[in-house]
Amino acid sequence: MTIFGICDTITRNEKEVFVLSYKTKNIIVYIAVVIFSILFCYFGNKYTMANYKLLNNQGVDATHPGVITEITNEQDYTYQNGLGGSKISFKCTLKDTGEEIEGTQVVDDYDPVPYRKVTKGDKILLDYDDTNGWQFTEYIRTDALLVLGAIFLIALLFFGRTKGLNTIISLGFTCIAIFAVFIPAVISGQNIYLWSVGICAYTIIMTLLIVNGPNTKTLTSCIGCFGGVVLAGVLTFFMTKILALTGVVDESSYSLTTVNPDHPIDLLAIIFAAIIIGAMGAVMDVAMSLSSSLHELKLKVMSISPKELFKSGMVIGRDMMGTMANTLVLAYIGSSLTVTVLIVIYNSSMTELLNKERIVVEILQALVGSIGILFTIPFTCFVCAMLYRNLKPYDNNVEFDEYAYCQQLAEEKEAREARALAKKQAKEEEARAIKEGKEEANKF
């Protein structure tokens, strides 16, 4: 009987039991991870907020959002040197109180890049002081960002469907963990090294379990990702010592030292956290891509040996090396392009430029992240080769592989029949031996 005949006749109910079992396990683990994530973020926030301190602007009211309802006046002025500007008066409705107020915006030529003049219908932020009254401070830009974010979420749901929804949930927990747990831990002066490692571990496990469920593919991805992140962390820790870094990369670094004098923020630990958190995303991508590819290969070719599976993984990994390393390097360059250009302009010596701490940190981020990716590839391939040796076709509880499942059932059925036949033959041999023994005894 063919393997498809087995699935169609003998083991159809067995297949349904396997599928139901893995779906049930997936749901239980999914709910457990979500509950744990909620508890982790809640109690983590409570703990890290114990010594949380912020520098508040004393004597200044909070910023208020508003909508301009009318432009009442625009007055131009000119300085003796020929430069000038405009003072624009307007009426505005505050969103939080509904109060109708009058405010002003000053657009001055001395500003390097002057703001666009306000118009009716603009959504803005205003501050109030006793001397100048209500003053324009900034345009509200979050509305447009929310629209773009909504498009991103809709695209995730449209293209990813269930996995897209799981991606959104895992991304939400990741952002909450960073902004509600890790950032308060940094500000309150706690051990940034431990918290950054803990957040990375939580993010890796939570993301992979929510997106892929509890299976061998998730396990290999987690192990491979941990390997790459640990290597990146160890390299960063020792390189910050070897390079004699201080952690002061720009003016904002000095500001961090004044936030919590009782529990000073470790600037070197900030660099450590920035590097491993930045590298974690790329390393996780590589580990998951390799694990998924080799998992699919194993399901399609059940007879492939661990050695051949490792070789196939390395072939796939080599194709990923260049693009992922470029992605990481270009991401770091793009995120600090303005500062990099400014530093280049004011430093004529290439030697001095390459030894600026800000540039050194950017190079360190790119190199450590790339090394982490390179190490992740063979490490993940090795883990997959070891753990996929006894892989079951129904181990992947997200997408059931019909052909591989039937092939596995056929092999299991043949093994059961062989064991049953051997057992039957053994019993027959034993019965024959007993019968012959009795016949011999009767002769005497």
Positions of the model-derived regions?
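Alpha-helical transmembrane segments and their helix-start/interface "positive-inside/aromatic belt" motifs
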Residues: 25-31, 216-229, 321-327
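Alpha-helical transmembrane segments of multipass membrane proteins
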Residues: 36, 40, 178, 203, ...
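Structural detector for short beta-strands of small beta-barrel domains
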Residues: 59-86
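Transmembrane alpha-helical segments that form the functional core of multipass membrane systems
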Residues: 150-154, 162-257, 267-278
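Hydrophobic alpha-helical transmembrane segments of membrane transport and translocation systems
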Residues: 319-322, 331-333, 337-423, 427, ...
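Generic detector of multi-pass transmembrane helix bundles and their immediately adjacent loops
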Residues: 237-361, 368
